[in-house]
Amino acid sequence: MSKPFVVVSCPIDTYSGYGSRARDVVRALMRSDKYDVKILSQRWGNTPYGFLNENNPEEKKMKDAIIPPQLQRQPDVWIQISVPDEFQKLGKFNIGITAGIETDLCDVRFIQGANRMDLILGSSNHSLYALKNSVYEQKDKAGKAVGHIKLETPTDILFEGVDLEKYFPIEPKDLPKTELVQSLDTIEEDFSFLYVGHWLRGAIGEDRKNTGLLVKTFLETFKNKKKAPALIMKTMTGPASIMDRNEVLKKIDAIRKSVQGRLPNIYLIHGDIEDSDVNHLYNHPKVKAMINLTKGEGFGRPLLEFTRSKKPIIASNWSGHLDFLNKEFASLVPGEVKPVHESVVQDRLILKESKWFAPDASFASLLMKDYVNSYKGYETKGKRLAHYCKENFSFEKMQEKLEAIMDKNAPKKVEIKLPNIKKISLPKKDD
C-alpha cells in the first residue's frame, strides 16, 4: 500500500525561527516513515538561505525531497508553515502551522487565511490567542453589516520540542576549547546574565524583544557596584554583517551614555553560530542565567533550549513561553498589557490597536540583584525546570503529538483486497 502524499511548504533552508520549526516538522514526519514527504522550499524575509548541510544525512534527505513549485498532483495532506495570511488550500486535507502574532490582536487577513485551512496548529496557547480573540465586522458592497469574520477552523497546539541531541548539559571541564569557549574564558566576571534574541525595531522599551530596556535596566541595576556581573548578548538587528555589528554596538553605546556612573560590562556575540557553539555558550561556567524581558513570544525557542543547561531563567510573565516555563521553577517578571508603541506598528503584523506586555523593570532589577546575591536557590530551580522541560517538551514528545494529529486527520489510503477466487475446471466437451 502506498504512503499518503504529504507536501510541506516552508522556509526549510533558511536561518530563521520558522526555518528551525520547518526542519523539526519535516524531520518528525520523515522519521515516522508513514508518509511520502516532499518539500516546497520558501524564502523567509531577508534571512540568509542555505542552512541545509549535505554532510548531515537527515538534512541531505530534506534537500533531496525538495520539489519544483508546480505540483504534479494533489497532496493527500498539504502543510504550510508560515504566517496565516499566506495559507492556501491545495491538498485533500490542509494544515497551517504558525507561531501566530505576539500581540493580542491580528489582522483580518490572518483570520481569512486560517479559515482556508482544515486545521491550524499553533506553537503555543498564546500563538493562537490573537486568532481567537480577533473578530471583524463583515460588510456588503453597500457598507451594511452582514455578519462577522472570526476564526472558524479547528485548532491544536504543536509545541516546538527541544532537540536533546543538540542541547544537553556539559560539565565545565568537558567543554571543548573552541574559539568561542576560549573567548568566554577571558571574561573577567565570574557571573554573567545571558540574553539571546534579535534587537528589533522600536524605541527603547518598545521593541518586541525589549532588548533596549534590558540593557538599560542591567546598567542601572549594577552601576557603581564593586563586583558587578556582566551581560552577554547574542544579538543582531538583521542579517549578520559588519554594518549590523556596528549598529548593535552603536545602540548599546547610546544607552550607556544615558546612564551616569561606573557601568558594568556588556559583551556582544554577533552573527550566526553553530548549534554546538550555542550549547557551549549555554553551558559555560561564567553564564549563570538567561534573561529575557520580552513583550511577547509566539513560543520562545531559545528559552526552552537554554533549560538543558540546568541553569535558571528570568522572563516576562506573558505569552508563548509560559507553556513550558513552569512558574514554580522559572522567575517570571510581572507587568501590564499595554498598547503597542507607534514606533513598532507594521502593516498586517503589529496593529496600532493591539497590545502586548510591558514588564516591570524595577521588579526585574530586584530579581537580577537577588540572583547575584542568592544564586544557590535559583540554581536548584533551574535544575528542576530542566527536568520538567526534558520530560514534557522534547523533540520526541513533539513528534509523538504530530503523529497523533496526522493519524487522526490525514486521509487514509484505501487498500483494495480482491476476493480469493476458487479455480475451477470446466468439463471437457465430448468429441
Residue spans for each PLM region:
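N-terminal pre-catalytic "stem/leader" segment of glycosyltransferase-like enzymes
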Residues: 1-75, 230, 400, 405
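Extended catalytic core of nucleotide-activated donor transferases of GT-like folds
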Residues: 7-9, 46-133
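Conserved catalytic-core segment of nucleotide-activated headgroup transferases in glycan assembly
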Residues: 21-23, 27-28, 164-277
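Donor nucleotide-sugar binding/catalytic pocket of nucleotide-sugar-dependent glycosyltransferases
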Residues: 119-179
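C-terminal amphipathic helix plus adjacent low-complexity
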Residues: 237, 342, 346-431
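Acidic donor-binding loop of glycosyltransferase active sites
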Residues: 280-298, 311
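Short glycine/serine-rich donor-binding loops of glycosyltransferases
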Residues: 300-303, 318
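Short hydrophobic beta-strand element within catalytic cores of glycosyltransferases
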Residues: 312-315, 331-332
